[in-house]
A protein has these predicted regions:
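Feature captures hydrophobic
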Residues: 1-133
Length: 133
């Protein structure tokens, strides 16, 4: 089973791609879990001082408290580990397209847009078009 990336490296990735995180409202959270038997999740959390990263228990989809959750199979998690210091979003986008990473939107599209997720979602390969319904 692949380990989650180091929280400091995950925070560094957010800093390198700061333009994707700047529009996010304080309190916005993105989680990463291994697909098989997740006990912990790695979080990006937006706060007043910017984006923090930390490992937290994963209590399940319904109560994990994130806006978006990325679930990676072992091979994709290995690629994420390799890419965390480089072009992480290209790796995530490729694995989402190939099905190795499943992206769960745990908020309605309108809520994600209102919280500033549009650029981040576009970087992951999701384009929202049209009026929010």
């Amino acid at each position: 089973m692949s380990a989650l990336p180091d929280a400091a490296a995950w925070r560094g990735a957010a800093a390198r791609f700061g333009g994707l995180f700047e529009p996010l409202d304080a309190g916005a959270r993105v989680g990463l879990i291994p697909r098989a038997n997740p006990a912990s999740m790695l979080l990006w959390e937006v706060g007043a001082q910017g984006v923090a990263a930390r490992v937290a228990p994963f209590p399940g989809f319904a109560s994990c408290g994130v806006d978006m959750l990325l679930s990676a199979d072992p091979e994709s998690m290995d690629r994420i580990l390799d890419a965390v210091g480089g072009d992480l979003f290209a790796a995530l986008r490729a694995d989402i397209r190939q099905g190795g990473v499943v992206c769960y939107m745990l908020r309605r599209r309108c809520d994600l847009e209102a919280r500033g997720f549009e650029d981040l979602l576009e970087a992951l390969g999701f384009a929202f078009m049209g009026a929010c319904r």
